[in-house]
């Protein structure tokens, strides 16, 4: 079991945490959704390093006057509370967070959630949705982009999440071929 855990951690690091292509997928989805004013947005990552890598990539590549922040378990309590409060009040356009965001957080202005965490947990998947579906007069629809990564193990997780969403009666649109034809799509480098 220890060997399997090391394998999974390395797979996750190589495929997601340290993979510039994975950052570009998140960036492309944000750019696409920003055209339709789907901000504020929350990007959920699994690990601290992934969270920081995505944040740095977005900060260095997104155009415009966007307020981008990140929060994870190592963020000091006082700073974390301020970031969460600013995001809740619409002062932060894009928040990149680890899964600590899953429980007990209320973000009524949130319009877009990008799940970049690639986890196989029905409970966490549904908890993420809970951050998104809070009602507010400023929104009539919400959007969830769930990034499905390549490789048998991670693809299986993505398929499971899609099944969880369908059980919740969500309209699931797979981008697959449509996304590959989209003008904003950048091909996979491999």
Residue ranges and their predicted role:
Residues 95-101, 113-120, 146:
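Conserved helicase core region in the C-terminal RecA-like lobe
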Residues 136-190:
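C-terminal helicase lobe
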Residues 40-42, 52-59, 65-102:
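Conserved helicase ATPase core of P-loop NTP-dependent helicases/translocases
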Residues 24, 52, 56, 81, ...:
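Alpha-helical elements of the RecA-like P-loop NTPase motor core of helicases
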Residues 120-143:
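Conserved SF2 helicase motif VI
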Residues 1-41:
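Conserved interdomain linker/interface between the two RecA-like ATPase lobes of SF2 helicase motors
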Residues 46-49:
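Conserved Walker A/P-loop ATP-binding site and its immediately adjacent core
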Residues 106-109:
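Short glycine/proline-enriched turns and hinge-like loops at secondary-structure junctions
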